[in-house]
UniProtKB/Swiss-Prot annotation:
Zn(2+) binds at residues 1070, 1073, 1098, 1101. RNA binds at residues 180, 367, 890. Residues 236-247 are annotated as: Loop A. It comes from Homo sapiens (Human). Keywords: Chromosome, Disease variant, DNA-directed RNA polymerase, Magnesium, Metal-binding, Nucleotidyltransferase, Nucleus, Phosphoprotein, Transcription, Transferase, Zinc, Zinc-finger. This is DNA-directed RNA polymerase I subunit RPA2. Belongs to the RNA polymerase beta chain family. Component of the RNA polymerase I (Pol I) complex consisting of 13 subunits: a ten-subunit catalytic core composed of POLR1A/RPA1, POLR1B/RPA2, POLR1C/RPAC1, POLR1D/RPAC2, POLR1H/RPA12, POLR2E/RPABC1, POLR2F/RPABC2, POLR2H/RPABC3, POLR2K/RPABC4 and POLR2L/RPABC5; a mobile stalk subunit POLR1F/RPA43 protruding from the core and additional subunits homologous to general transcription factors POLR1E/RPA49 and POLR1G/RPA34. Part of Pol I pre-initiation complex (PIC), in which Pol I core assembles with RRN3 and promoter-bound UTBF and SL1/TIF-IB complex.
Amino acid sequence: MDPGSRWRNLPSGPSLKHLTDPSYGIPREQQKAALQELTRAHVESFNYAVHEGLGLAVQAIPPFEFAFKDERISFTILDAVISPPTVPKGTICKEANVYPAECRGRRSTYRGKLTADINWAVNGISKGIIKQFLGYVPIMVKSKLCNLRNLPPQALIEHHEEAEEMGGYFIINGIEKVIRMLIMPRRNFPIAMIRPKWKTRGPGYTQYGVSMHCVREEHSAVNMNLHYLENGTVMLNFIYRKELFFLPLGFALKALVSFSDYQIFQELIKGKEDDSFLRNSVSQMLRIVMEEGCSTQKQVLNYLGECFRVKLNVPDWYPNEQAAEFLFNQCICIHLKSNTEKFYMLCLMTRKLFALAKGECMEDNPDSLVNQEVLTPGQLFLMFLKEKLEGWLVSIKIAFDKKAQKTSVSMNTDNLMRIFTMGIDLTKPFEYLFATGNLRSKTGLGLLQDSGLCVVADKLNFIRYLSHFRCVHRGADFAKMRTTTVRRLLPESWGFLCPVHTPDGEPCGLMNHLTAVCEVVTQFVYTASIPALLCNLGVTPIDGAPHRSYSECYPVLLDGVMVGWVDKDLAPGIADSLRHFKVLREKRIPPWMEVVLIPMTGKPSLYPGLFLFTTPCRLVRPVQNLALGKEELIGTMEQIFMNVAIFEDEVFAGVTTHQELFPHSLLSVIANFIPFSDHNQSPRNMYQCQMGKQTMGFPLLTYQDRSDNKLYRLQTPQSPLVRPSMYDYYDMDNYPIGTNAIVAVISYTGYDMEDAMIVNKASWERGFAHGSVYKSEFIDLSEKIKQGDSSLVFGIKPGDPRVLQKLDDDGLPFIGAKLQYGDPYYSYLNLNTGESFVMYYKSKENCVVDNIKVCSNDTGSGKFKCVCITMRVPRNPTIGDKFASRHGQKGILSRLWPAEDMPFTESGMVPDILFNPHGFPSRMTIGMLIESMAGKSAALHGLCHDATPFIFSEENSALEYFGEMLKAAGYNFYGTERLYSGISGLELEADIFIGVVYYQRLRHMVSDKFQVRTTGARDRVTNQPIGGRNVQGGIRFGEMERDALLAHGTSFLLHDRLFNCSDRSVAHVCVKCGSLLSPLLEKPPPSWSAMRNRKYNCTLCSRSDTIDTVSVPYVFRYFVAELAAMNIKVKLDVV
């Protein structure tokens, strides 16, 4: 990862020259590196998970042992391999490799085969290795296992993909899914916290604690806490299989090492040797252990093993000491490999906890990005895979027991191979996780949530698609909290999280996006050589004694491992040396290492120490190191101890150490597309970040190869004349999202109030903002027949008058055919009976058949049973459709105004859009005014202006720059012109501000939302009109609407709408007893009777002359019946 190479070649300014280049549209030899970087964190984390990580995960799975017929059986997974996606054996095909486009088209999953080598042993003696198929697992597109890996753009196009296909997602049942990056606590770092709810965990507990999120190299995670008790002792708590356990700290320390009590005592009081309270507290913790009769390490291990083995499910022949070792390996500081390292880490956490409880140390903010990292897709994939491999071993034991109960089972390879096939299939758990985003786990995987882990990477437009891979979510549980602390924008997130790219609704502050320059570390590095380097620089090893007292030294931690101590006077020099090695790539120091020196201040502040981090999943970003003149990757924690300048005039010698690569590095990719965003009010930039993702544009170029449920397309897109340099850096002209429009700021009609806008009808007729919606429908005849029956195929019956000239001979509509409501849609035949069936087009919206794809099954042996019909629905702008500029100025099309009635300039120019001037004062979108002037000058001079934020200032005014350009072209300096009324032809008195603004058409269209009906379906229970636009239901009429009609004095209209036209019914009621349920119709008279008239009788009063009819809502009758079922009587007073 070269920290600065990406940003050394930023375009100096935008240009339109590539649009007129003869090679425009011809695929490049290589893909655009900038776009590929956006998904690199997703792809590389998955690459690590399926190669190095998978091997480490298999090694970390302990052998599964159980007893069978007085013998000890053990199964060990030696190796696991995931294969690239291929077709099954025996498939009829030309090529064995499966490509993503095929899975999208057939609505199947892009997956690879998982096989494992299982070693089985009897009484510790290996008997053989069995290679077993465990199921299919999803494969990330463009990863090392994907068949598209390293293909050039031309080859990608040949495989029906985008030339700039970025990957980073999974295809589950034909739908593109992205694993959402979640905020997690910083791994292997003790975080001091104060939580009042911890007092409820038991008697004597306080609100003070130190928490650590322990993560191994294969990403297995466990959360562990130290609690401070009122009596000065410490309690260790951890989670095993979603169950919370507590253990006095003294037992854990004694069990980890064979040190004497005095040595443990000395380690815990380091730096506070004269603190009598700490000495007494430590003595009390060790005394608790002695009171249980545990004076040696072996006795403590035996005691803990006896207490915990019932929850650990270890084999019966394990001694208690081994059970306790299993507990420490799986639950206590699992990121550390030796018990000695765990001992020193627990001692450090204890010292920090006492400092917190005594007010000598501040609490760490868990909501600050300093103490956070992100959950990458590869991390979740590997953790889930490891747990399912362990579950597969357990399922083999269950299958073994079931088999043994029915028949006698002998231990041999053939029997085991048959039993292995009875184990759980890993295909369904993975598909469920990716399809629903819900996690089914026995351990919880150390995560804070079990839902919302995956989202659909919908391609509404290309900007929305990009944002899925840069999104970072705080977590689903935090959305339910009433506190706002988790949503706050803290200064520590500068340069890592975009301050404006967050939703303005419920998820505000929870769903954030990485800045354009921010990167996620995805690589593991081995740090075995770093401790020796630290010792050479002056660090005292952990088992040595420093020259000064411990209170004058900093602890040194490397990735959560206590390395040693360093003199506080030497620490700054060591940190500078490490930073020098890091920037110059010397001494095998990785460039993404984080060097954090938290100094002693003499006041309650962060716990001091020298902390070094090389672990993955951290956020880093490049800045310019002024001393060395090179780019350096800095992390979230080390940034707060640096002095980073933004502009050259902010650099002070001896104080400033770093400088930003460019001023707009604090913005996300999407926010960088907003022109002159530094001139807008911040909420407007937030709105544009959201509306930019709702724009009709060009989400992709392979419309013919896609089978998405819905795709949008703008028919007449244009390249913006005014745009930031980042727009060209990401080649966004390949996926345009709007149109350059002539906008006049004038209140010309009464139809432009409340953000409404007038559009020139002639511009609309010429194609302004015309668009289409592509809708695809899968038709599978196998769903229409019984299982095992294969007699239905597409086709028509010759001479069938129902489909004459409407359907082709294959029973499908013609390509390009126009479909209206009631037209034949498709036809199929029953080969056994010869019967034909015709299905009709049911949508009220006219469409054109764009393309039809015939789909088969996985083995290529499917008959003509499944097709995908893609229809193109024209969606030209209509009154009520939503538009927006790139500055959060949204509005709806209120009127298509005839061109002859529109105002016009002296040169005869008629604006495309009339914008109400009242939209500017309160919104303060000065950037839109500047864009209007810049767009006007760009059109006049044939230029493309740079709208990158922060390039203008008070000294270098944008108004002066663009005003002079307009003046040079012969126009007014301030961008105004004299307009003439299109109605009277007279010159308007006021100067009208007119220019070119890039406008976006949003996906919110009246055609998708309008709902009206006269008669239709009714609910079977309440007899009221059903709701829902898709079923032609009625509109919702709520209490506020009712109050509005009452306030207008239209009560009769209210009675007609909500009663007569809803669920009016005539019911019989007994006037005497007031019952609505007791009147019943008499039994039918016998056939020989001369009386044929049947009357209503009250079953309570036994009278028929007291029955009357009333008009009541049908739902009221249902309500009375429900109350009667609860033994509640309703009595009516009939007047």
